[in-house]
Amino acid sequence: MSVTPVACDITTAAGQQQVLQACPTPDILINNAGGPPPGDFRDWDRDAWIKAVDANMLTPIELIKATVDGMIARRFGRIVNITSYSVKMPIDVLCLSNGARSGLTGFIAGLARSVAAHNVTLNNLLPGVFDTDRQKTTVAALASQRGVSLEEARKAKVAAIPARRMGEPAELGDACAWLCSAQAGYVTGQNLLLDGGLYPGTF
């Protein structure tokens, strides 16, 4: 196996072309964009909304559009979008993310069913609180906001999770690998939560 890194702005047509030139006929597509910044929706102008929708909804759709027909022709394809548990459990300060990612979720729900007969699956992974650099930044902001130590802020965040811990990045990778496998061929159009039980609903 060889890995070909491509440094580009994937939200642009030129960036997408660079990626597809490096791998023109992928059997597996994983879309993963960093979340838009938190804040108050009153402070965001139209450009902020367009940027969020472009990165977290339109770019994945463009990449799916460029690759799904080849998957259909080869009768195998796996598409996974890494979004957020906020799709099912919206976070008040992440309205940009809530809106853009929910739009992608709705799009996938329809498309997944239209290509399922060709052994092409489309699913979304919805990670909760994972022990990543981004989470460290979030914990630091929480500590500053509450006037507590980093350790106290981290403990408060973990206490809200029934599993009483943050997720490990490898756990997300394992779940993604399974969705991309032949063994997951009967799973499509789904939103798989990896949140340690944080979401309180039944479906």
Regions found by a protein language model. Give the residues of each.
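Short, small/polar-rich loop/turn modules that mediate ligand/substrate recognition or access, typified
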Residues: 116, 121, 187-189
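Alpha-helical segment proximal to the catalytic Tyr-Lys
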Residues: 69, 113-114, 185
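Substrate-binding pocket helix/loop in short-chain dehydrogenase/reductase
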Residues: 40-42, 48-53, 79, 157-158
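Catalytic loop of short-chain dehydrogenase/reductase
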Residues: 80-103, 108-117, 129-130
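A short, exposed helix-loop element centered on a Lys and neighboring polar residues
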Residues: 64-65, 109
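Short C-terminal tail/terminal secondary-structure segment
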Residues: 89, 177, 188-203
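Conserved NAD(P)H cofactor-binding loop of Rossmann-fold oxidoreductase domains
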Residues: 33-37, 197
